[in-house]
Amino acid sequence: EWIIDGERFTLHGAIDDATGEVLALFFAKNECLDAYFEVLRQILVNYGIPLSVYVDKHTIFLSPKFGKLSVEDELAGKRVNDTQFGRALKELGITLIPANSPQTKGRIERLWGTLQSRLPVEFKLAGIKSIEAANAFLQKFMEVYNQKFAVSPANRESAFRELPKAVNLDHILCLKEFRKVDNSSVIRIRYFLFH
């Protein structure tokens, strides 16, 4: 949680596990799907499609039922529905890897510690007073940070695939609801009917 000019915000981000390079950072009013979609968009546009994404077990990434189906349920063909984030990753061909303990997320946790000590000072020096200014500043900050701290990967083979020009990210990084149209051409979303 961050305070910018008296308001609280949440920082979302991603780091390359092989290099320590900060791939994306984004502030939002709270931890939310839209902010994680923005982080993913930054990665896709600037680096391409990652082969995999390592995430914690937040319900934005994984259904609360993830890993809880019995063998009988699995044999009966039942499955846990993807979250919207999980669905977007599948559409992009990205493997989602859930972290099983905080220790397995060492790099990102160390990054948060570094950012919590450095960014407030940087914001003050730059006169940052709004979330918009903070997000714009983060783009420049990442460049400087990565030049200073990122390292060469042990394996030179890229873990990113090129993002095809034909891919419209607005059609993937969005909410999608699948519904059936009834006989009177009506769909229901929760308690609402649409004609």
Over which residues does each language-model region extend?
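RNase H-like DDE/DDD metal-dependent nuclease/strand-transfer catalytic core used by mobile genetic elements
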Residues: 2-11, 19-133
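Residue-level recognition of short loop/turn positions
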Residues: 18-19, 190
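Short helix-capping and hinge/turn segments at secondary-structure transitions, especially at repeat
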Residues: 117-124, 128, 139-154
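C-terminal, beta-rich DNA-binding module of retroviral/retroelements integrases
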Residues: 142-195
